[in-house]
Swiss-Prot record:
Its cofactor is Zn(2+); Fe(2+). Pfam families: ADH_Fe_C, Fe-ADH. Its main location: mitochondrion. Induction: Induced by transcription factor ZAP1 in response to zinc deficiency. This is Alcohol dehydrogenase 4. It is found in: Mitochondrion. Inhibited by EDTA. Zinc. May bind iron when zinc levels are limiting. Reduces acetaldehyde to ethanol during glucose fermentation. Specific for ethanol. Shows drastically reduced activity towards primary alcohols from 4 carbon atoms upward. Isomers of aliphatic alcohol, as well as secondary alcohols and glycerol are not used at all. InterPro entries: ADH_Fe/GldA (IPR001670), ADH_Fe_C (IPR056798), ADH_Fe_CS (IPR018211), Alcohol_dehydrogenase_Fe (IPR039697). It comes from the Eukaryota. GO terms for molecular function: alcohol dehydrogenase (NAD+) activity; metal ion binding.
Amino acid sequence: MSSVTGFYIPPISFFGEGALEETADYIKNKDYKKALIVTDPGIAAIGLSGRVQKMLEERGLNVAIYDKTQPNPNIANVTAGLKVLKEQNSEIVVSIGGGSAHDNAKAIALLATNGGEIGDYEGVNQSKKAALPLFAINTTAGTASEMTRFTIISNEEKKIKMAIIDNNVTPAVAVNDPSTMFGLPPALTAATGLDALTHCIEAYVSTASNPITDACALKGIDLINESLVAAYKDGKDKKARTDMCYAEYLAGMAFNNASLGYVHALAHQLGGFYHLPHGVCNAVLLPHVQEANMQCPKAKKRLGEIALHFGASQEDPEETIKALHVLNRTMNIPRNLKELGVKTEDFEILAEHAMHDACHLTNPVQFTKEQVVAIIKKAYEY
């Protein structure tokens, strides 16, 4: 096996207020003529996609819009967006939103050059050609999809989420302008922020972690610990929103290169089965999966190290677990899977599907099916 480690991030990332204008100028200077904006009904309703459309049109581009992306984008969303792209013969894709819009846009951009069905690319690096250039404008501080090589698309017929992990879907430009997040509701701030925290922790205990991903993960945890609750309490707190932009990006740098674990492997199944918010699923599962991971000595030590970043006086993995539960309660995250409407009769199939999700491969413990079911049961009854 090769000992070479790759490190993947977008070639260019813009941060700070004014990043939207900077991105529009950059696109103009690249001499692109036709763009497809991919977004969701909420972003369209508040006028942000229209604002970006106007910026691009003022710079000489013809712009088409697909604004029907669902919270858990599915195959139909990808197909419909691709149809709009082909009708206009778009050269680039501009995604505006959180993970859902970015994931849908990545899938569209990938199929535009590679053809076939999106399910053909499930797994790791299954494509042969680079996707169309993607400019990912972020409106939440959580998924980091604006800068990763991960795309998650729901197959509603099979009730699963397909994990497409492919270097070719990495956006060309990632954009984090905190002003686009000032209006984010508290519940969404919490869910997306806890998604970012999950990225940090899963990457830090991952079997594929390295010194670079470790540094990103720990700094991400520091910023989240300092600023997430502040952003939750006051959405217009500029410093908190800016810190969370950097935190979620650092989290993305960590998991984009160290990958994830069973929190995400299970959360994908909950989203596929019940259409639940991804960040909320992660938040509920995170302490229980990490508690189970403590049977791995290295993971246990690392979870102890994380406790220091939550303000503990000494390395203690139990303090990390406690801190995660406290953070959930502080931001009114549902206590358990039962409150989310998960059904006990689905435990077995959820576990089976999670064990086929690519994210489980780098979990520090390779659980048996019975152990996965036990984790689900504990998260259900807690």
